[in-house]
């Protein structure tokens, strides 16, 4: 893994005004050759919003609830991450070559950077949105452990960057709103992390209906159990512990940290919360989306 030595903490690179992890920005060129298929299914989220959770659910659905098949490889090999590229590890595009149809794909890209082929092919999308406060806290911890990001700095300075859209993948506010708008004209199932926490079974039924598949209720119950945070946290095929420590240091903060709603309250000060709420109201004005930041 000597390739990884120089990967630590490069500055973000801007592409079409969107800040990205340096290596991911470099992957966007090769990604132009990607061709979507009508039977592809895209999992789209802003980072730290339940991507791996919904990926595991969808892989289980595609494998007919067979747990053994879901253990065949780590989640990032089972669900290729389109823009993923880090020295020493197969890129998303490389993983894609070995992925049989029907394919599950993952992205965090905002619409400005999304390969047009996905929209042209009317590929179905499962989008998961999570409340901004929990995303910001989770992202801060993720920046610490995933060394492809720049240094996060203090929590206060990171929160300011998050609010300004100066973190990897840019503005949360724009991301959740533009994919919401797309859901009115494109086959997008728009889910909320908080709804999944509250009643995972109900949300899994929604996903099944959306992808046009049916499974017996006992299989769905098994899926609820197997894709619970507790189970996924200890599952090496889901928890990213198979990634080299030089890239993701779980001793700093585990990839699967708390998986709860409302954890932001342990991190935000009263002043930060008030400041955030004022800014949030401005940025989300006129948007019909409403989020729950506690359950």
Curated annotation (Swiss-Prot):
> What's the subunit arrangement here?
Homodimer.
What is one GO biological process annotated to this record? xenobiotic metabolic process
- Reaction catalysis annotation: a phenol + 3'-phosphoadenylyl sulfate = an aryl sulfate + adenosine 3',5'-bisphosphate + H(+); 17beta-estradiol + 3'-phosphoadenylyl sulfate = 17beta-estradiol 3-sulfate + adenosine 3',5'-bisphosphate + H(+); 4-ethylphenol + 3'-phosphoadenylyl sulfate = 4-ethylphenyl sulfate + adenosine 3',5'-bisphosphate + H(+); 4-nitrophenol + 3'-phosphoadenylyl sulfate = 4-nitrophenyl sulfate + adenosine 3',5'-bisphosphate
Q: What is its EC number?
A: 2.8.2.1
Q: What is its main location?
A: cytoplasm
GO MF: 3'-phosphoadenosine 5'-phosphosulfate binding; aryl sulfotransferase activity; steroid sulfotransferase activity; sulfotransferase activity
Kinase keyword on record: no
* Biological role stated in the UniProt entry: Sulfotransferase that utilizes 3'-phospho-5'-adenylyl sulfate (PAPS) as sulfonate donor to catalyze the sulfate conjugation of a wide variety of acceptor molecules bearing a hydroxyl or an amine group. Sulfonation increases the water solubility of most compounds, and therefore their renal excretion, but it can also result in bioactivation to form active metabolites. Displays broad substrate specificity for small phenolic compounds. Plays an important role in the sulfonation of endogenous molecules such as steroid hormones.
* Underlying gene: SULT1A1
State a single Pfam family of this protein: Sulfotransfer_1
List Phosphoserine occurrences by residue.
138
Q: What is this protein called?
A: Sulfotransferase 1A1
Q: Which residues constitute the catalytic centre?
A: 108
Amino acids binding 3'-phosphoadenylyl sulfate: 48-53, 130, 138, 193, 227-232, 255-259
What keywords are annotated for this sequence in UniProt?
Answer: Catecholamine metabolism, Cytoplasm, Lipid metabolism, Phosphoprotein, Steroid metabolism, Transferase
